[in-house]
Amino acid sequence: MVRPDALRFQPSDAEEPESSPRSRWGEQPFAPETVAMMRRTRRHPRPTQFDYLHVHRLVDDLAAVLARLGPGVEDVLDIFCGTRPYNDLLPPEARVTGLDIPGNPYGVAEVVSDEFLPFPDGSFDLVMCIEGFHYVSDPAKGVAEIRRVLRPGGHAVVSVPFVWEYDRTALEHRFTGPELANLFRRWEEVAVIENGGRAVSWATLTGLVVSMGEWHVPARLNLRRLARPLFSGLYIVINGVGLLLDRAERRFARSSLTLPMNLLVTARRPPAERHS
């Protein structure tokens, strides 16, 4: 039963934008091999991907954050879990619950609901929301809900895009680092990590523009398959240049100004706090 005051992932069906994530997916679920391929590109990106540097930095930062959590992570919630590409970064003994919205095409979530979050107070030691929190309609209430379902001393790990395209007809948020930190201001051990800077953003957006050309190559007569080596080579060159520029940026950049692809925030619910 949905709580009367429950926060939802997105507007109700009556208010849902025409091009919301749910409507763009269509009605047919992805085939298992498609889900596996998508999971691989998110967990083990290759230089032949246009978004290689972006995903690589996100995975590296996420792996480091999860490794520092230490023992005691038994129950994990993965919000907007998608293909669940990061489950292997968690302790092998952890019980992981995947949550996704109705109509998602992946078919790997244990719980499917529009409610954010349909769980009792203090249910989890770790709550993850990787590349999905920007869809939550009320971010402050979303953070409060994450805190509610965490046990005292539990951790939240949330990542959001910063330099990325958005859908003009869908509800999405963009956050700066200080904005994210402010959302978690009543938590402990709050840290915001930038997943890449200007160089990674440049390489990813340049690759994205090139990928638009790849997807416009007609699929008939195997033309897209025949063109794939050409585009793979272009992505390798773009990612190589981006990697060199990123190393230079990290070495010489001294300004407080930044332009990351992504932001990753980690925070701890105070251990002495009682469930509200």
Task: List the model feature ranges, each with a label.
Residues M1-L117, L126-M128, T258-L264, P270-S276:
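Conserved N-terminal segment of class I S-adenosyl-L-methionine
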Residues A140-P152:
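A short glycine-rich, Lys/Arg-flanked "PGG" loop and its adjoining helix->strand segment in the class I
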Residues D125-S137:
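A short SAM/SAH-binding and catalytic strip from SAM-dependent methyltransferases
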